[in-house]
Amino acid sequence: MNIKIVCVGKLKEKYFKDGIAEYQKRLSRFAKVEIVQVPDEKAPESLSPAQMEEVKKREGERILSKIKDKEYVYVLAIKGKERASEEFAKELKNLGTYGHSDITFVIGGSLGTSDAVNKRANDLFSFGKLTMPHQLMRLVLIEQIYRAFMINSGSPYHK
């Protein structure tokens, strides 16, 4: 299985990089994991609604340029579907069983994702209504992907 995580913005914090690298290493026995960073759109602190949409549109174009037609795409969104870890593990297993070997996860920038990115999604995925920095979300997501593979392998990692 090939897993791609497309994220907006560059990760600067060493502690996030180290955590993500650790899970990427652990996942290597189950899947090839690629993390693709696209530049975030520089914008002033206070934006009008139209300016916010323009920022999301530009970031969305960068995101969409990294997604191939054959990929099954999860977009992380507050309004997406929440899942338990076991349910997510079953979904990933079923995707592989039914021929989806290329799975992409999208983490938008601080304003979220554009309508075009959300329309491209096969599924909108929510980790709940909490607001988290998108840098932290990368670590949370890759840990949950690892947890899903461990659940599917029968490992005691998930208790």
From Swiss-Prot:
In which residues is S-adenosyl-L-methionine bound? Answer: 76, 108, 127-132
Classify the main location: cytoplasm
- One GO cellular component term noted in the UniProt record for this chain: cytoplasm
> Which Gene3D superfamilies does this UniProt record tie to the protein?
3.40.1280.10
InterPro entries, sorted: Alpha/beta_knot_MTases, RlmH-like, tRNA_m1G_MTases_N
Annotated EC: 2.1.1.177
Q: Which family does it belong to?
A: Belongs to the RNA methyltransferase RlmH family.
**Record note on quaternary structure:** Homodimer.
Protein's recorded name: Ribosomal RNA large subunit methyltransferase H
Which source organism does the UniProt entry give? Lactobacillus delbrueckii subsp. bulgaricus (strain ATCC 11842 / DSM 20081 / BCRC 10696 / JCM 1002 / NBRC 13953 / NCIMB 11778 / NCTC 12712 / WDCM 00102 / Lb 14)
Biological classification of the source: Bacteria, Bacillati, Bacillota, Bacilli, Lactobacillales
**Gene it is expressed from:** rlmH
